[in-house]
């Protein structure tokens, strides 16, 4: 069985775009692969964080992923900072990565140009090696990523090839070269207010996204005010009708009906009826998730699952870390 690793940033409540584009697929992947889902809190502190809020977001995100259907019997879900091998591996990887490689990373270039090099943390430059460590520690064969993160996977692959070539003995590879697993087509959900840009939880216009924890009345209001067009005809056309096309994608993901079935069902009907029904479909989708989320937050079950997840993750990560330490010559002697 192949292994999948995915890191999840604890940076606010996911949107239905995150659910449709990633979380929903994770639930399916756990049935076919050996999955590790890691809440990457060490990555979060590359920018300033309020400690209490960060801890709250870590538990909240873990509860939400379990509430949508991640099964701790099938997948390992854990907190990055609770497995110290991540930081140790990150240092070994930094020492085998050039400054030039890191300065070419898009996120560092964008933020350092925006804020000036003196205004960003060193962690923003060096976090890609930590991300490489996240992946290689679990011998990941596949990493699900969006188009915006393919660059990090290329860095990971380049590093692993270089590390194995430099340190492997008798052609025995030390680390596994991961493959990119691109999300399925059609899973990109757009803003409700600007349907040509991706839905984002950091959107300053809160009407542009639906949070996984939005109340039913809020969901109905946001969908009612979603931007469409003046024709009133429900059809799928990304170029000319991006608004209604986006709503059709959401409706399809929420109900399991195909876009074609939905277009046929609403033939001759207006946007008002369509939006009202879509809102109820989204409410029905999120309601059981929200109930389970609240149960987990209020119980000891969540912490028990995360404790066990960290323990299972350590068993695998520490073995890989020891291979890396042995390879580069750390410690007084080779350990197994």
Curated annotation (Swiss-Prot):
Q: Does the keyword ATP-binding apply?
A: yes
Q: Where does L-tryptophan bind?
A: 134
Alphabetic keyword roster: Aminoacyl-tRNA synthetase, ATP-binding, Cytoplasm, Ligase, Nucleotide-binding, Protein biosynthesis
InterPro entries of this UniProt entry?
aa-tRNA-synth_I_CS, aa-tRNA-synth_Ic, Rossmann-like_a/b/a_fold, Trp-tRNA-ligase, Trp-tRNA-ligase_bac-type, Trp-tRNA_synthetase
Q: So what EC number does this one have?
A: 6.1.1.2
Localization (cell): Cytoplasm
Q: Motif location ('KMSKS' region)?
A: 198-202
Q: What does this protein do?
A: Catalyzes the attachment of tryptophan to tRNA(Trp).
What's the protein here called?
Tryptophan--tRNA ligase
Question: What organism is the protein native to?
Answer: Enterococcus faecalis (strain ATCC 700802 / V583)
